[in-house]
Amino acid sequence: MTEIYEQAKHSLQGEDFSSFNYLFAVNKLLSNPVSYDLGRDLIVRALDSRERFSEHTTILKNMVRKSGLFPYLKKEFTSLTPDDLRVLELYRTPFSDGYVFHSMQFHIFDLLKSGQNVVLSAPTSMGKSAIVDSLLGMGTLKRLVLVVPTVALADETRRRLQERFGDRYQIIHHSSQVCHSDQAVYVLTQERVNERDDIVDIDLFVIDEFYKLAFRQLKSGDIDHQDERVIELNIALSKLLKVSRQFYLTGPFVNSIRGLEKLGYPHTFVSTDFNTVALDVKTFGIKANDDKAKLKALGEIAHACVDATIIYCKSPTVAGLVARELIRLGHGTPTENPHVDWVSEEFDADWDYTVALRNGIGLHFGALPRALQQYTADQFNAGKLRFLLCTSTIIEGVNTIAKNVVIYDNRDGTRSIDKFTHGNIKGRAGRMGVHFVGKIFCLEEIPEDNLNQEVDIPLGIQGIDTPINLLASVQPDHLSEFSQDRFDEVFINDRVSIDLVKKHSYFRVEQFEMLQSMFEMMDDNEFSSLVFHWTPATNFLKTFAKIIARLVPHTFSRNGVPVKPTDVMIAKLAGYLSAESYSEYLKNQIDYARQWISEGEKRTLSIALNNDLKLITNTFGYTLPKVLSLMEDVVKHHAVKRGIRSKVDYTHVKLAFESFHLPPGVNALEEIGIPIQTLHRLVDLLEFSDEADVDELSQYLRDTQDIWSRSIGYVDQMFIRRALGIRRH
């Protein structure tokens, strides 16, 4: 059957092409379940070359029907028979008269509609989100939880659902929101699922990218049991299984999932290769570190590919290097627009992101401020940027429309990517209804098959290596006898409190013990630097830095800040806390970076700025508030033991780190795409309520549009309007 497929595929480009023979081969492949996917692939390729099938349009249409690609039946053909129209009516989605299911979507929708638990493993292009929207469109489900891997994807999902179902459902996506409706959809990361206590009586929960439930296998063959995001996702799964009537797990192609059945949750596992686009893959086999050969190959690809192209790179630094090389080779399009000027002013004109954007090339990476991520993706999808250079953010569900994908590196940071992740990146090429055939260019060899295409869920497969902080926070019903025994053994001596581990599940038991030991060894003078309730005590930052260096050193070291000695770390902490604003801190850091570079440091300004953006978002905004919350509880305990009666409350310091120097709550607007710099200008202009949630803040900005539209710049206004969904008159 493969031979029939290859011959037909090859013939499509030939001069003596016979459309009848091609469609005859398609029919043969579609008639055999073993070769059905190959037949469907040929149909997609035929639609990409419609002009070659003008003599046999009816046969082509019938083959489209036979392949189950009903959306193409609706979109690509005008002369539809009554029977064709009946098929389209049968496969029409409940949320839109204009959207039609393909056969696999309909199958999954039918399983879920009948109340079954479903685990779906399918390619990126299959259209998994349309199934969720259709379930909502039926109107029979009242409360749903959608668990997504990133805040960026939560925001993208929120926008889609708000537009389609905002009149019927309250869309909850931020910790500040209170549920006030009988009909609600929670769109949250796993950490936010675990923070909320109002997630009860759920009709259906969905976990997107369910493979993230499994601990990663390292190159050495060992399993990384310390990934706190995997732990948090398993805790969320346990919580949701307990309060939900049904679940739907989705992700890219894997072979099997293990662990759910041991927990007593029957489910239907569907693994399908149902693609709505065809993919052509070319491999170059260049060595990993041979940048010269890679850049040469990339130049050839850029010359040959005129359509929208995503280039996957292992890091923002490499993405910046590649962008500058594309510009040097003449593949940039010099652009002058207000957004480029805004970025130059607010960040720096020499920053890789600014230089790329000025030349019609987009950069997209995790530490990039949300508003710039959204703007870049919007411009790319609108066809205004030919190239989009991404890091692993491409895997996290950024919604893009690209004809071509170039995989420049087979790594994510310093980690090698496996065939599983490689395939996930490839799935970003092509787009149903836009690009029939996607082209993939792999500059290195394709990774070999590995066992990572099986997903083992730690919650269901509990062993000697299952982290105690995971076990402490899951539902008691989900603990195995073996885990209960381990659990009792760890907590028998009361050195570490169970309640503390449950409350701070981000941290491993060894980290709790480490912190306890540090406090026990502190003299009164050092310990007193931790006892305060508003303004940090003298020498607090010195002691805090010492604790960070022991507990979570990577939060600084992976972002270019040495943790030993702690002087540089203390300077960063002090610089951030004492700055008047986010902008002031960034500008100061850029000035320092320029000074280092002039003194011969090998780091570039872009590396320094990208590291600081990561520090602000990941370290200051996320990790350090968690460390402070844990410290506060442990300090209170030790203060009592030491006979200290003073009040201990770190709320003010935590807010200083996580709020970007904005009033309480206002930073929530950054998540929906309003830059922090713009928010500072709005704070100077308007009176924000301290008690308002993100919905109320958004409404307040809509109500005050007459004020801010006269007082702040054009680009700031564009960001606000995009975030709030305000269309210009």
Curated annotation (Swiss-Prot):
The record's annotation in SUPFAM superfamilies points to:
P-loop containing nucleoside triphosphate hydrolases (SSF52540)
One Pfam annotation, family name? Helicase_C
Under which name does UniProt file this protein?
Anti-bacteriophage protein B
Other remarks on this protein = Part of prophage CP4-57.
User: What is its quaternary makeup?
Assistant: Interacts with AbpB.
**PROSITE patterns linked to this entry:** HELICASE_ATP_BIND_1 (PS51192), HELICASE_CTER (PS51194)
Give a yes or no for keyword Hydrolase in this entry: yes
Molecular functions per Gene Ontology: ATP binding; helicase activity; hydrolase activity; nucleic acid binding
Where in this chain does the record put each Helicase C-terminal domain? 297-472
- Tell me the protein family, please: Belongs to the helicase family.
